[in-house]
Amino acid sequence: MGTTSSQSKTLYQKLYDAHIVHEAPNETPLLYIDRHLVHEVTSPQAFDGLRAMGRPVRQPGKTFATMDHNVSTQTKDINASGEMARIQMQELIKNCAEFGVSLYDLNHPFQGIVHVIGPEQGMTLPGMTIVCGDSHTATHGAFGSLAFGIGTSEVEHVLATQTLKQGRAKTMRIEVNGTVGAGITAKDIVLAIIGKTGSAGGTGHVVEFCGSAIEALSMEGRMTLCNMAIEMGAKAGLVAPDDTTFAYLKGRQFAPTGEQWEQGVAYWRTLKSDADAQFDTIVTLDAADIAPQVTWGTNPGQVIAVNQIIPAPESFSDPVERASAEKALAYMDLRPGIKLTEVAIDKVFIGSCTNSRIEDLRAAAAIAQGRKVAKGVQAIVVPGSGPVKAQAEAEGLDKIFIAAGFEWRLPGCSMCLAMNNDRLEPGERCASTSNRNFEGRQGRGGRTHLVSPAMAAAAAVSGHFADVRELSATTH
């Protein structure tokens, strides 16, 4: 290797190195944190810790809060999701007022899921470090920012010092080349990736997604991709910023303006992996091979194309995978050898920080239009934020959903996780656009299948999983 190669860096290494505040021998480096996003579930103990030590929030202007995990999606009443939820939301209101942190509370027009509102308001910018007490913070990596989830004690540390100890991760490049077929979305791409790597394939790595199929994605598609980097075990996901990124950000509330914007873009254009940068792991996929994906098991790596058969445990050579498949099939009440298109569903959830943005809702509405939700199926659509809801209503998407028999709800995390009133009953089967199909994730005993918004809408109107490509081809 020549001298140039030893100097060349991946995008992750550039972001990491630019934020080192202090690095002592044999110590984990201390990184500066540019943005800290806060929600009601992982912050109360952190603020209590500051109060006990008499510390202020060091940079209230770099800290933004909202309530999302346990809000009701049917009313703006703070009491609607039960006592624990009410206490957490009231604590957040009190803490933000006391410590001078801006809060998008239940009645704020911009309230919504933290990972939807950050990018939407331009709080998320390329080149930043971004943390939140939430595992899906990786979403913001779509902008070429180093974004990851942290625990509650770390939330307190960032509030107090605006820094965090963070070791270097390994690097992984996932390249998706070519063009996807009709009806294939970012959700299908990322589920296909996790199907290939497995749910632990990215452990210890920061993943950079690249290739022509990734460059062709909108910012919302890239957010879906990075949102689920965590589901392959990765620390964070990244997409290098480009003209698509800059066009999305220009004019947003917290985006720079004028000369600062020009300077920002000039710097952001340098945020890409050098041509000869070395990655620890490289994974490649051909976009043309990707079909609509549906998970069959209890981790996102247990996934197949909608037209494939559910695998038999014996088909796995690894004994751990075989045992995991056996357990998953029993929990999910599925038989190997059949197709998921033969499997009936009870509920459909379109929403979450993975798939609740305007393009997601448009894709679902295109399938719902002129059709009806199947008898016996409850289908809910939960926009990711106030602005997404307002835009969808301006475009008449709410009317399409309501006419088809879907419920049109208020913004929040909703049925992605059983922390509010939207949940599965034991044994209920759900086609969900969220990111985790773990046992009990959507409610104790609930069975979750992860799909794209269009696939979720197709399941809702069919009463079972269906290949969206066949529905798209038929007239209503």
UniProtKB/Swiss-Prot annotation:
SUPFAM superfamilies in alphabetical order: Aconitase iron-sulfur domain
EC number: 4.2.1.33
Entry keyword Cell wall biogenesis/degradation: no
InterPro entries: 3-IsopropMal_deHydase_lsu, Acnase/IPM_dHydase_lsu_aba_1/3, Acoase/IPM_deHydtase_lsu_aba, Aconitase_4Fe-4S_BS, Aconitase_4Fe-4S_dom, IPM_dehydratase_rel_enz, IPMI_cat
Cofactor: [4Fe-4S] cluster
Iron-sulfur in keyword set: yes
Domain of life: Bacteria
GO biological process: one example: L-leucine biosynthetic process
Reactions listed under catalytic activity: (2R,3S)-3-isopropylmalate = (2S)-2-isopropylmalate
Protein family according to the UniProt entry: Belongs to the aconitase/IPM isomerase family. LeuC type 1 subfamily.
Protein role: Catalyzes the isomerization between 2-isopropylmalate and 3-isopropylmalate, via the formation of 2-isopropylmaleate.
Designated name of the protein: 3-isopropylmalate dehydratase large subunit
Species: Yersinia pestis
